[in-house]
């Protein structure tokens, strides 16, 4: 759980960094800060408003300034040993294998690997995985927080329950409600698959349960009791939208408990994107809000790997998103609703949970802030109204849902936050995972592209290949192996231990200038079961 200053006072920390290093920091709190000149602006979630220019103003001679000073926190010739590197990379890895019955796995999923590599302190990414116990299928998701980790934490805990409830038939919802009324034990809805370090908020569990119960009560009232097939796409959309609505409502109503009152406000004023997969037999649905991605790994007949994108980024690079925003607001806002590729010139993702500063009316924002705790009322960011803020809401948590029917050649699915996709091309991601899972990486010829390679350099590449092969065997987790490549790859696509060591040795105030938090889930499909489904249909 982050300290209050980590959510509501990011500018203070950023300004200190800018004074120390002579330039504005590259802060993946993704808040009102700007980047050093050498970092692309399109990698920031937030850009500065002129009112904050004095907080984040880079020096004109920033590079000479940094070269003229040395700090103890800057690594010079210190390198982590391979065991130390492995210890860092494997600290958050988790693997789950679907259990067999009578010696057989009847699920379309063999299992999954997940891992996280933080750059923020604390990490703002979250991950979740659970088996639906009252319906069929498994849920897996990654959540990328900004302006702190409060919103991503809440969404990672709550969203799967909202999805599971949305998928339940009317009679099961009635059974659960009757159990609550009579004080009987509830039917378990989800079986979680979590790393021991993954956090659950015990303090907010009652608040979260009451909101969820209100949701299923409304579903009971809306349903006439007639048996009908549940539309998974509609259930996913309803769950996303309802959770975001509850996050907003809880912040508006507040709580008598001062801790919970502050918590719900932190959740609402921070934000999070989400990319969730629901796998039921050969039916794969991906619900995406924001700029995390889902990528399908397909093995072609010749053994090569192809990447099939199952999600779309909701940002300025998506023409349909730009058109949607313009249609949702008056024509006189066409030039202001998206400026410098950001929502109102500030926010990079066009869809997200929380971020009520882009959803609430100005009057509502002022009322909540004035009646809220002092930490909220005294903060400059929370009181700041985005420019050209005329017709809210400008932001939505409604997901875009993609459906794919699994085939035997569909071998795995990669869910990852943008920290991975900023460093690696989707085709490289699929190839590396595919080669890892099949053990075929060492059979491929070395590709040097257009480089002129000397005999000595070729010897170095062969040495690196041997090291790369050994890293495959030491990585028992596909997500860990992918992170190793994302952070340590050189220009030839091989893991460079020196580079990997340098990147992992960076102090936290510098790490954010070079990379984002990375969270990955690799889901491996059971080709035999998928093929059996296909044969039954034929």
Curated annotation (Swiss-Prot):
UniProt transit peptide range: 1-71
Cross-referenced SMART domains: PP2Cc (SM00332)
Stated family: Belongs to the PP2C family.
Protein name listed in UniProt: [Pyruvate dehydrogenase [acetyl-transferring]]-phosphatase 1, mitochondrial
Record bears the keyword Hydrolase: yes
Every PPM-type phosphatase domain range: 109-525
GO molecular function: [pyruvate dehydrogenase (acetyl-transferring)]-phosphatase activity; calcium ion binding; magnesium ion binding; protein serine/threonine phosphatase activity; protein-containing complex binding
Organism: Rattus norvegicus (Rat)
Residue numbers of N6-acetyllysine PTMs: 202
GO biological-process terms attached to the record: signal transduction
A Pfam family this chain is assigned to: PP2C
Cofactor note: Binds 2 Mn(2+) ions per subunit. Binds 2 Mg(2+) ions per subunit. Mn(2+) can substitute Mg2(+) for catalytic activity.
Stated role: Mitochondrial enzyme that catalyzes the dephosphorylation and concomitant reactivation of the alpha subunit of the E1 component of the pyruvate dehydrogenase complex (PDC), thereby stimulating the conversion of pyruvate into acetyl-CoA.
């Amino acid at each position: 759980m982050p300290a209050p200053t980590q959510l509501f006072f990011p500018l203070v920390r950023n300004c200190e960094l800018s004074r120390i290093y002579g330039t504005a920091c590259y802060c993946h709190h993704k808040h009102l800060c700007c980047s050093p000149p050498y970092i692309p602006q399109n990698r920031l979630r937030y850009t500065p408003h002129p009112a904050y220019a004095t907080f984040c103003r880079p020096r004109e001679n920033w590079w000479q300034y940094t070269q003229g000073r040395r700090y103890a926190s800057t690594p010079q010739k210190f390198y982590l040993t391979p065991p130390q590197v492995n210890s860092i990379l494997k600290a958050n890895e988790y693997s789950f294998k679907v259990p067999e019955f009578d010696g057989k796995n009847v699920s379309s999923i063999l299992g999954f690997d997940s891992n996280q590599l933080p750059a923020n302190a604390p990490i703002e990414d979250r991950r979740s995985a659970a088996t639906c116990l009252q319906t069929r299928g498994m849920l897996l998701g990654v959540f990328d927080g900004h302006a702190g980790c409060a919103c991503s934490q809440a969404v990672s805990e709550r969203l799967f329950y909202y999805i599971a409830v949305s998928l339940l038939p009317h009679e099961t919802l009635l059974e659960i409600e009757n159990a609550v009324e009579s004080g009987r034990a509830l039917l378990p809805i989800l079986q979680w698959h979590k790393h021991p370090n993954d956090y659950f908020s015990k303090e907010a569990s009652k608040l979260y349960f009451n909101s969820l119960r209100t949701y299923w009560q409304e579903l009971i009232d809306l349903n006439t009791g007639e048996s009908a097939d549940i539309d998974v796409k509609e259930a996913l959309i309803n769950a996303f939208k309802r959770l975001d609505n509850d996050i907003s409502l809880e912040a508006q109503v507040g709580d008598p408990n001062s801790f919970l009152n502050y918590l719900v406000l932190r959740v609402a004023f921070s934000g999070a994107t989400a990319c969730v997969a629901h796998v039921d037999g050969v039916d794969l649905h991906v619900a995406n809000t924001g700029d995390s991605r889902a990528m399908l790994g397909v093995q072609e007949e010749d053994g090569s790997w192809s990447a099939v994108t199952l999600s779309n980024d909701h940002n300025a690079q998506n023409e349909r998103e730009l058109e949607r925003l313009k249609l949702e607001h008056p024509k006189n806002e066409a030039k202001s609703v998206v400026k410098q590729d950001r929502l109102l010139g500030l926010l990079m993702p066009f869809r997200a949970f929380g971020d009520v500063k882009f959803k609430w009316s100005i009057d509502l924002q002022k009322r909540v802030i004035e009646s809220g705790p002092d930490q909220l009322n005294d903060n400059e960011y929370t009181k700041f109204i985005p420019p050209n803020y005329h017709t809210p809401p400008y932001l939505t948590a409604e997901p875009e849902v993609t459906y794919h029917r699994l085939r035997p050649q569909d071998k795995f699915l990669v869910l990852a936050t943008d920290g991975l996709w900023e460093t690696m091309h989707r085709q490289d991601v699929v190839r590396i995972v595919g080669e890892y899972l099949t053990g075929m990486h060492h059979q491929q010829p070395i590709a040097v592209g257009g480089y002129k390679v000397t005999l000595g350099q070729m010897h170095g590449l062969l040495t690196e290949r041997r090291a790369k092969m050994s890293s495959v065997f030491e990585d028992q987790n596909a997500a860990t192996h992918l992170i190793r490549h994302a952070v340590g790859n050189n220009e030839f696509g091989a893991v460079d231990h020196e580079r990997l060591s340098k990147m992992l040795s960076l102090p936290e105030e510098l790490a954010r200038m070079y990379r984002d938090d990375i969270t990955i889930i690799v889901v491996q499909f059971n080709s035999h079961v998928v093929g059996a489904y296909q044969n039954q249909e034929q």
